[in-house]
Amino acid sequence: EEGRLYLPGDEAIMAEQMDCLEKQYDYNATRPHEQERRAALLREMFAQIGENCYIEPPLHANWGGRHVHFGSGVYANFNLTLVDDAHIYVGDCVVFGPNVTVATAGHPIEPGLRRQAMQYNADVRIGSNVSVGAGAVILPGVTIGDDTVIGAGSVVTKDIPAGVVAVGCPCRVLRPIGPQDRETYFRGRKIDVPLE
C-alpha cells in the first residue's frame, strides 16, 4: 500500500528483487551495437515501455524497472537511477539528462523507525514533453506536469505544474514557458528552424 511503513529487507522481497536485477545486469552489459537486444530487455524489465525509447547504459533501478511505466519517445542519458519500489509513470517525449534520480522510496525522520530500517514508498508521475536536466533528483510522491523543464541539479520535493521552467534546491517555479521561448533558445540565440 502506497505510503505505508514496511521493512524492505524481507527475504521474500529481496529474492524477488534479485531476479529483476539480473535482467538489469544483462542490459547494462550490452554492447553499443546491440540496440535490438536492449529494446527487447527493456520490454521484459519495465512494467510498460512505449515505442522509440532509448536508455543509455548504465541504468540503475531497485527493481530493474519492474514498476516503471514509460510512454513513447523517452530518452535517458547515462546513469538514470530509478528507485522503483513504487510506480514511476513517465509520459511521451520525455528527456532525462545524465545522472538523474527518480526516487519513490523514503525513510521516516523518527530515529527509532530508521533504526528498524523502515521505509515508505509513493508513486512519481512525470507528464509528457518534460525535460529533466542533468543531476536532478525527483523525490517520492511528486507529480510534474506536461511541457515543463526541470533545471539541472534541481531537487524536486513538491509537485510542479505544467508549462513552466522550475529550478533549484528545493525546486521552485522560475517562470512560465511563454512567447519568448518560441523566439530564442539559449542565451538569447534566435531559433532558426521550423517550429511545430
Which residue stretches match the model-derived regions?
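Short arginine-rich
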Residues: 26-28, 158-163
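Conserved catalytic segment of ABC-fold P-loop ATPases
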Residues: 145-148, 161-163
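Short glycine-rich donor-binding/catalytic loop of glycosyltransferases
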Residues: 153-154, 159-160, 171, 177-178
